[in-house]
């Protein structure tokens, strides 16, 4: 009789017998504006080809990822306030793992931080978060969902 508690599973990695072609590209643009503003953006792409039918490559990379940001390193209150906001997007893709194959959905997030400078003591106070809209997403098939992360920090002797 089969006993699920005594089963042993094996995963054996092998190389493809034919030439596999993978390629990627990226483009980034930062533009400095007046009054300490900066606009930034980037887009990246990756692909793989030349695989035999049914070969599992474990490539696990979305075809496209992009982000756009707006930053200001000093405004108001004698240029003591600063902020950064970044919107991120990632395509969905098929995730291939040793425990299973499944679809990872596309997702987008918004990261933001507000900074206050304390020049007399060379310090910063920051309040922000990653994925501030708390939109849950996965980066791998079977992995836990990722939500928002929020923080307040104090940094001493930074400038």
Regions found by a protein language model. Give the residues of each.
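Conserved C-terminal beta-signal and adjacent last beta-strands/turns
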Residues: 57-159
């Amino acid at each position: 009789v089969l006993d699920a508690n005594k089963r042993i599973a094996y995963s054996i990695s092998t190389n493809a017998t034919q030439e596999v072609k993978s390629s990627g590209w990226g483009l980034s643009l930062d533009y400095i504006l007046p009054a300490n503003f900066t606009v930034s953006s980037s887009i990246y792409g990756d692909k793989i080809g030349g695989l035999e039918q049914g070969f599992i490559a474990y490539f696990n990379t979305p075809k496209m990822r992009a982000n756009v940001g707006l930053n200001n390193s000093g405004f108001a209150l004698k240029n003591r306030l600063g902020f950064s906001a970044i919107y991120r997007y990632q395509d969905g893709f098929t995730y291939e793992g040793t425990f299973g194959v499944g679809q990872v959905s596309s997702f987008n997030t918004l990261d933001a931080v507000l900074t206050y400078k304390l020049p007399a003591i060379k310090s910063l106070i920051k309040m922000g978060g990653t994925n501030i809209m708390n939109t849950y997403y996965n980066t791998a098939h079977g992995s836990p969902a990722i939500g928002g992360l929020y923080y307040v920090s104090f940094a001493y002797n930074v400038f």
